[in-house]
Amino acid sequence: MMMGNTFGSSLASLFFLWATIQQIFPNHLRIAIKEFLISTIQQLSFVQRFSDRFINFFSPYVEISFSQYEDYQFNHAFAAIETYLGAKATDKAKHLRASQVKESKGLVLKRDETKVRDEYEGGTVWWEMETDSTGYRTFKLTFHRRSRDIVTDSYIKYVFEEGKSIQAKSKQMKLFTNNPSSHWGTSKKSFWRYIDFEHPASFHTLAMDTKKKEEILNDLAAFSNGKEYYKKIGKAWKRGYLLHGPPGTGKSTMIAAMANHLNYSIYDLELTAIRNNSELRKLLTATSSKSIIVIEDIDCSLDLTGKRKKEKNLMTSREDGEQGTEEDKSFVTLSGLLNFIDGIWSACGQERIIIFTTNHFEKLDPALIRRGRMDMHIELSYCSFEAFKILAKNYLDLDTHPLFKKIESLLKETKIAPADVAENLMKKNTEIDADGSLKDLIQALEGKKKIHGAQVDEPKDKYTKKFYKAFCMSSKA
C-alpha cells in the first residue's frame, strides 16, 4: 500500500511538472526535457520493480539461470547440463558441433542449437543458451509455474546425474602409479603419474568358471548401483576384493576386466615407495571416486610386523634413481593400511573398489582379509576344461574339435595356469593352424604330467624343504 502511495504521488508530481514545462519552454526544449524525464523514470528502481511484478503477474512461466562461472570458478553444473543437452536427441538435431574433449576417448558430438525442448514426467521445459559480451555462457531453464515442484525437486537433479553419467562413459580411463614422495610438489596431481588405460580384457574373454564369473558380475552391479543402499545402512560406498591363486591364473587380467566393465580408472599403489602412514593417507585421499585401488602381491609389499622387506625397498629406490639410505626406508604399518580400508578414513571419497592380490593366501594375516575389509575372496586357480574352451574360442575361434577330449583328460590330471595354456594356443606364425596349436598344448600338458608324476610328497622339515624346492625348480628349467 505504501509503495502504491509513493508511486501515485511521484507520478502526480511529474504530470504537474510537465504541464508547467509546456507553458514556459519552447518546443525544441520541451522535446529534450521530455526524453530526459522518460529516461529518468525508466531508471527509477521502484518503477522497474513494479514493471517486473506486473509482467510476472500475467506470465505463468518461471526461469532459472545456470552460469558458466560462479565467483570466478567454473560451474560444474553448467558442464553437466551442456553434456546432457548435447547428447539429447543428437540424431534429430540439424546442427551438431564436434570437439575433442580433454580426457575423452574420441570426438564428442553436441547440439549446436541455442534452444532445446525437453519432456519430463508429462511436463515440458525449454533450455536456452545465451552468451554475454565477454564470451561467458549461461543456460536458462524456462518452465510453467505449475511444474515448479517437479523441476526443482527432481528434474534438475536428473539432468545433473545424467550429464555426469554421460561424461563418465566418454571419459578415457587411466592407469595411475604413485610417485616417490621426493618427487611430490605442492599440488595433489604430483602424487600420481598416469598413462591412458587401454587394456582389452573383458569378462566375455576371461577364462574362468561361468558361475563364478556371473557371481562376480552380479556383485559388481550391486555395488555400482548401491549408492542409496550404502547410505541407508550407514557404510562407506566401497568394496574390497581379494584375488588369490598361483602365478599366471589371471589376477591382473581380472582387475583389467573389472575396470573396463565399470569404466573405472586404476590406481596401482606401490607400498614400497611410501615412507610412512602419513604419506599413504595423502596418496589415498588424492584418488578419485569411481576408481579401483590395487595393491598387488600384498604379502610381499607389506610385512605384517610393520616393517618393509629391505631387498624390495632397495630395488625400488634404485629404480627411482635414489640411494637405499635409512631415510628411504618405508615404515607403512598394517594398522595404517587397515585404517584406510575400513577405519575413519575409508569414508574419504566414494564408489571405490580396493583390490589385494596374492600368490600365497596362507601367508596373509587374518586381520587383513577378514570379511568387511575384503568383502569377496576370489580364488583364481589352474586352468579347467571350461576355461580352456573359452581360451580356444578367443585364440582359435573353435567351439569344438576332436582333440578337445584328450585335452580335457589331461587337464584333469595336471596343473597348468591359464596363461600357459594361452601361450600354447597363440599362433606363433601364419603357418601354424588350429590343429598345430592344440597339439602344442597337448605336448606341454604331457610334459607337465611327467614332471608331476615324478614328484614325491614335499618334506616338512624347513631345511630339507629348501633344497627340495631348489631341486624342483632346476627340474622344471
From Swiss-Prot:
A GO molecular function assigned to this protein is:
ATP hydrolysis activity
Q: What is its EC number?
A: 3.6.1.-
Family that this chain belongs to = Belongs to the AAA ATPase family. BCS1 subfamily.
The keyword rRNA processing is annotated on this UniProt entry:
no
Q: Please give the PROSITE patterns that the UniProt record associates with this protein.
A: AAA
User: What InterPro entries does the record tag this protein with?
Assistant: AAA+_ATPase (IPR003593), AAA_N_dom (IPR025753), ATPase_AAA_core (IPR003959), ATPase_AAA_CS (IPR003960), Mitochondrial_chaperone_BCS1 (IPR050747), P-loop_NTPase (IPR027417)
Name its co-factor(s): Mg(2+)
Q: What induces it?
A: Induced in roots by salt stress.
Q: Which organism is it from?
A: Arabidopsis thaliana (Mouse-ear cress)
Q: Where does ATP bind?
A: G245, P246, P247, G248, T249, G250, K251, S252
**One Pfam family this sequence matches:** AAA
Keywords, alphabetical: ATP-binding, Hydrolase, Magnesium, Nucleotide-binding, Signal
Tell me the leader sequence span.
Answer: 1-26
Q: Name one GO biological process term.
A: response to salt stress
Q: What is this protein called?
A: AAA-ATPase At3g28600
Q: Which reaction does it catalyse?
A: ATP + H2O = ADP + phosphate + H(+)
